[in-house]
Design a protein with these regions (language model features):
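N-terminal accessory segments
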Residues: 1-30, 60-62, 294-310, 398-403, ...
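N-terminal flexible segment immediately upstream of the FAD-binding catalytic core
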Residues: 1-55, 72-102, 253-264, 306-330, ...
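C-terminal substrate-recognition/cap domain of FAD-linked oxidoreductases
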Residues: 17-27, 212, 224-391, 395, ...
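Active-site nucleophile and cofactor-binding loops and adjacent substrate-binding regions
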Residues: 45, 68-69, 128-137, 363
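FAD-binding subdomain of flavoenzyme oxidoreductases
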Residues: 93-249, 441-442
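Activity-critical C-terminal alpha-helical subdomain
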Residues: 172, 414-448
């Protein structure tokens, strides 16, 4: 039995061993990945707490899982048996907001939507906008390089990060990046840690880039189609225009049906799929009308433009609605925009071949698709759901896509790595991991 005496001395009541409390922090939102029985939980309140915890774990060769808000979907934050959990939820301070330079320093445990609201008091906003923004944390967004609804206009999380504070596996603390727009000093360590899913170090704070809130009132639009592939073709056409929306999402008929049964919004279930999006700026109304007119010319049978957020709220509720149905297996694939219609055709063929319904929601404007299959509590049905999602993932790869657009790899997608990365790339990843975490304590067996 490993002695926790040194950690108790360093952390006091911030070290928790109560079994019920530890269990509550032992997994993320994925139901398809198992968790272990950790020996203790660190409720870190400072970088020094994280440093002490990692220094101890490294000396003891104890595996560490790192947790923000637990909204991840790939088992990346799940506990290890005999391991240590480090929770960053108490590191929830916004250190400063600098409107002149459009920068802010924030600790990793700050909830994304709350941080965005604080920035808006200064006429600015934080660009990353995951569907779970009201629950997820800035640190979690950085660790997975999260995307979200506004990606097509503002990029992924890495495009909004200037500096990081990172605690390495041995407890040493380092800073990466610079406040300036240009910085070519040394390797780009900031981007190395972004999206590393806790395998290279624990991100404790960041300086992030903000943008000014667009003038005028945003406009929301909807276009419904009889066929899923027609909606994909419309997305390709929309994104080829000189002016594109800030948000462009897709929900197929099954996903709208699921959301409406979970939390009715009054949104009509389309025959095939619907596009929902948002335009911003003083010409938002003009932009939205142009988009729905384009959609109508490409087969949309029903369109609308409004100032209501109901449509986007329905999209944000898709994952909670799916979770309410029970165990599910999902993917997070990405495909080139021009291949969306082909991707949807393939997904429908796979679903028909297996005789199962597949729900698809997408950050359509950047080609990021989330396909989900219900997996009832039987080993046989779970295997079928896994096989369907694997087929969809391989189909996306055949179109020049990726196995993960924003959720990360964690443990759920670990078996897919070799489908996308060649052996040399995997060796390079391993070399980087060994250099920064020679004892392999940081989320071992996940991400890479």
């Amino acid at each position: 039995m490993t002695s926790l005496d040194a950690l108790v001395t360093a952390l006091g009541d911030r070290l928790v061993t109560d079994a019920a409390t530890v269990t509550a922090y032992s997994r993320d939102s994925s139901r398809a990945a198992p968790e272990g029985d950790a020996v203790a939980l660190v409720l870190a309140e400072s970088t020094a707490d994280v440093s002490a915890a990692l220094s101890w774990a490294n000396e003891q060769r104890i595996p560490v899982s790192v947790r923000g808000a637990g909204t991840g979907l790939v088992g990346g934050a799940n506990a290890y048996s005999g391991g240590l959990i480090i929770s960053l939820e108490r590191m929830n301070r916004i250190s400063w907001i600098d409107p002149q330079n459009r920068l802010a320093q924030v600790e990793s445990g700050v909830v994304t939507a709350e941080f965005d609201a604080a920035c808006r008091e200064h006429g600015l906003f934080f660009p990353p906008d995951p569907a779970s923004a009201k629950q997820c944390t800035v640190g979690g967004n950085i660790a997975t390089n999260a995307g979200g609804l506004r990606c097509i206009a503002h990029g992924v999380t890495s495009d909004s990060v200037a500096e990081l504070e990172v605690v390495l596996a041995d407890g040493r603390v380092m800073r990466t990046g610079a406040l300036t727009r240009k910085n070519v000093v040394g390797y780009d360590l900031t981007r190395l840690f972004i999206g590393s899913e806790g395998t290279l170090g624990v991100i404790t704070s960041a300086v992030v880039r903000l943008k000014p809130v667009p003038p005028g009132a945003p406009r929301t639009f909807r276009a419904s189609f009889d066929r899923l592939e027609d909606s994909g073709a419309a997305v390709t056409a929309i994104m080829a225009q000189s002016s594109t929306p800030e948000v462009l999402e897709l929900m197929d008929s099954f996903s709208v049906e699921i959301v409406e049964s979970f939390h009715p919004t009054g949104v009509a279930v389309p025959s095939g799929a619907m596009l929902v999006g948002q335009t911003v700026g003083e010409d938002a109304e003009e932009q939205a009308n142009a988009i729905v007119q384009l959609c109508s010319s490409m087969g949309a049978n029903e369109t609308e433009v409004s100032d209501s957020d109901v449509l986007l709220e329905a999209r944000r509720r898709s994952n909670p609605a799916l979770n309410a149905r029970g165990l599910k297996i999902s993917c997070d694939v990405g495909v080139p925009i021009a291949s969306l219609a082909t991707a949807f055709e393939g997904i429908e063929k796979i679903a028909r071949r297996f005789g199962r319904r597949v729900s698809t929601v997408a950050h359509a404007g950047d080609g990021n698709l989330h396909c989900t299959v219900d997996a009832p509590d039987s080993a046989e049905e779970l295997l079928v759901a896994d096989e369907i999602i694997d087929e969809i993932t391989k189909w996306a790869l055949s179109l020049g896509g990726t196995i993960s657009g924003e959720h990360g790899i964690g443990s759920v997608k670990h078996h897919e790595l070799s489908w996308q990365l060649d052996s040399v790339a995997i060796d390079v990843h391993g070399a980087i991991k060994s250099a920064l975490d020679p004892n392999g304590i940081l989320t071992p067996g996940r991400a890479i």
